[in-house]
Design a protein with these regions (language model features):
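Acidic and generally charged, gly/proline-rich low-complexity regions
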Residues: 1-124
Length: 124
């Protein structure tokens, strides 16, 4: 698994709704050097509502990880579920300062969502 596996070439997509599904496991955490949890098993989905000038993105995740119990010091399975939405618009330069709005340069044709999915899972 590589971060480019989470790149969406949106320039060729028609106006309308598009779904992108990703099966996640521990190799996904390895992309980010994240070692706090193991045993990641889950599915992430990004639904894109594309118009001529704006994309509405809805991310969802459902899965589980293995976590260490603070009391028993044993591994247990923790179920996870999370979702968030973000809007993508075009502007002069890249800007992700607003957590609900992403601005891409007019020249961009690819949406890189690996970091978005990582945050979706880790913040579950």
């Amino acid at each position: 698994m590589k971060t480019k596996d989470f790149n969406i070439l949106f320039s060729g997509l028609s106006v309308g709704t598009h779904h992108f599904d990703f099966e996640l496991n521990d190799t996904f955490f390895e992309l980010f050097g994240y070692t706090d949890y193991t045993g990641l098993q889950g599915n992430a989905r990004m639904t894109m509502l594309k118009s001529e000038t704006v994309f509405d993105l809805d991310f969802t995740f459902k899965g589980s990880i293995q976590a260490l119990c603070d009391i028993m010091n044993e591994l247990f399975t923790q179920e996870l579920e999370n979702s968030f939405s973000i809007q993508v618009k075009f502007g002069e330069e890249y800007n992700d300062e607003n957590e609900e709005l992403l601005i891409l340069p007019h020249s961009e044709h690819t949406l890189k969502i690996a970091q978005n999915i990582y945050e979706l899972v880790v913040l579950s």
